Amino acid sequence: MGKRFARMLRDKEQPTAYGADQRQRNEPNKFQVAYLGSLEPGHAHATAHKLAKRIDVIENNEPGAIDLTENDLVFITNGGCVENSSMGSQDKPAAYNTELKPGGGWDMWRKIAAQDPVFGHPDKFCHDPEQTNWMSATVETLDQKIIPYIKNICKRDPFTGHVVTGGIVTVKDSSWLMSWTINRQPQFRDQPKDHCLVWVYSLFTDKPGDYVKKPMRACTGKEICMEWLYHIGVPENQIEDLASNSANTVPVMMPYIDAFFMPRAYGDRPKVVPDGTVNFAFLGQFAETPRDTIFTTEYSM
């Protein structure tokens, strides 16, 4: 499947052919709104005036288009809390990529919102990744050497097939504000039965650690594991050996993961069906819905 980019035309006289000018050809995710007043009086949508007219498609590097009518439905996931996320490895930090590039959910939302305030204000959420980023890491234990320290805290054996931590364990005095959790094991069908998966995350990625004296965002997976081992009580003379040989740790940096928690006012997120729209709607954490849920319980795709 190729990437699909949506574009709305500002008025019905504007050329509808893909690449009507070179700027549009270079920015196929341009999304413009048509203010259509041409519907016949008495038509079901005669008073509505925002209509999605066309979806430009790039598939196998070839441009194409899907023409739309008022009977079609277009669903838009605007923004995106995991956009620009990156993975590291045991020996490599996860990159901190904050630049929002053309083609992503934030770029598309900005282009939509620039045409009508009814489409919200994306920069309320994505203007400062220093306020919205945090990191997670998956620690896979490779033998039994770390397990006793886990048992000592959660008072449960992670290999019984039952609940392990029963929730999040937060290290309150951690400079990174580290937390960790272990779900019912095994988590994956092909996971070795004697391996345990631990999810570690921290909110302050710019602060030096308590054991590893560097910010989490600059740490390899091994170094993040060392910081976690320190906080679960592993003797300092064993920490590096266990992080190197008894675990494999994969870090993930998410620059916009907390974007939906940024201060906002009513109207900063568009309604699911904005006033006056005919055939398109917004979905996800950045659409205004009554009694919505957020963060790991939401419905965005």
Language model: regions and residue ranges:
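Rossmann-like flavin
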Residues: M1-Q14, Q22
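Acidic carboxylate-rich catalytic motifs and surrounding loops in phosphoryl-/glycosyl-chemistry enzymes
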Residues: D11, A34-L39, L242-S246
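Short His-Asn-centered micro-motif
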Residues: D11-K12, Q32, I76-N78
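Acidic, proline/serine/threonine- and glycine-rich low-complexity intrinsically disordered segments
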Residues: T16-A20, N26-P28, V33
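A conserved short coil-to-beta-strand element within the FAD-binding core of flavoproteins
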Residues: F31-N61
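Core beta-strand elements of the Rossmann-like FAD/NAD(P) dinucleotide-binding domain
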Residues: N61-L73
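C-terminal segments that line or cap access tunnels to active or ligand-binding sites in enzymes
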Residues: N71-N78, V82-S300
